[in-house]
Each structure stands twice: as C-alpha cells, then as structure tokens.
Amino acid sequence: MLRLYPGPMVTEAEGKGGPEMASLSSSVVPVSFISTLRESVLDPGVGGEGASDKQRSKLSLSHSMIPAAKIHTELCLPAFFSPAGTQRRFQQPQHHLTLSIIHTAAR
C-alpha cells in the first residue's frame, strides 16, 4: 500500500496525464525516491508471489532506507489521483507494494 505508487504515477503523468499531473506528483514525492521506485516497477518479479528471496531482500533493503515521513506522504497520493481514474491502472503495483511492506515489517 505504499511502495511503488510514485514511480508509475509520474511516468504515466509525463506521457498521458499532462504537465499538471506530473508537477503535482513531483512536488509531493522527491525525485530520488521516484527513481528508486522505478527500478522496482520495471522488474516484474520483485515483490510478486514468484519473487526469489534475493529479490525480496533487495526490495526490503531499499525500502528500509526510506524515512517514515516520505512513506506517509506516499500514502496520500492515491487520494489525489483516484478521481481521474488512475487508481485502476495502478492496482498491480499497489499489490506488490503491500507485499513489500509486510516483508519489511517481518524483519
């Protein structure tokens, strides 16, 4: 519910949603944070049910470096974008995100 939202959201905004959506995403989530997330989004195995332990460990490691303040900010993002119908597009990353958080919390 927290990890992969900004990456695909900003990517979609730049290509389809127009500059308003892109600037809103960029202003809420730090750019360095987004680039970290994009790597995970581009790897279809990370966080998924078929992911190896090595992939999960890598995901947890990068997640553990994220300050709690940024995580909280990220949780607010879906509320901004759901009226535009973008939430439907990001259900898959959201699912991976939840797995990542559960795995990180278990450590």
Curated annotation (Swiss-Prot):
<keyword id="KW-0963">Cytoplasm</keyword>
<dbReference type="GO" id="GO:0001917">
    <property type="term" value="C:photoreceptor inner segment"/>
</dbReference>
<keyword id="KW-0913">Age-related macular degeneration</keyword>
<dbReference type="GO" id="GO:0001895">
    <property type="term" value="P:retina homeostasis"/>
</dbReference>
<feature type="region of interest" description="Disordered">
    <location>
        <begin position="1"/>
        <end position="21"/>
    </location>
</feature>
<dbReference type="GO" id="GO:0005739">
    <property type="term" value="C:mitochondrion"/>
</dbReference>
<protein>
    <recommendedName>
        <fullName>Age-related maculopathy susceptibility protein 2</fullName>
    </recommendedName>
</protein>
